Amino acid sequence: ENIAKRLSGLGLDFTFFDATDGKKLPASVLESVDYDFYPKHYLSPKPLTLGEIGCAISHIKVYEHMVENNIKSAIILEDDAIVSQHFKEIVEDTLNKINKNHELIFFDHGKVKSYFFKKRIVEGYRLAHYKAPSKNSRRCIIYATAYLITLSGAKKLLNYAYPIRLPADYLTGLIQKTRVDTYGIEPPCVFRGLNSDSEIDKIEHRYE
């Protein structure tokens, strides 16, 4: 409800996708998950939680929807995202200045290495082009709160999506694995809600 009011107030069209509740997934889906991959390769203290599995599937379903309907690009916002009042202008200016071959733009992200030159965009923000780490690096661009993905980017993520074995932000953030051409807005212009968990993870929080 809060994000709907915010986006409507900014004059942005949007569509809600039903989140996948990991606790309600059928046994056939849960049995197909590779629970060992994440802790083995990325030093997680525990295997994927049901909340993380549901979250990953929710994002993957959007990529599949894009491919099935030939949607050229989409901005994906998690339900607890807090969007800057300048978000619309930031997106428009970014798309006017970015390389046409871009595939992924993060509006929220953790630390990440980028190429030296950054383009200035509205309201003092900068557009950075991110460097892919070495192929076997564990480094990842964390957070899948808000990002733009193109059709070609969605196809690349789907090539690495199955079996389910990573949280949503590891699938988007492991650009050394997916080879997605990735950019980001610096500093972030969308933030994670601090007082409420995402609808798909109310009971089982990732870091608890």
Annotated model-derived regions:
Residues 1-77, 81-208:
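An acidic/histidine-cluster motif and surrounding catalytic segment
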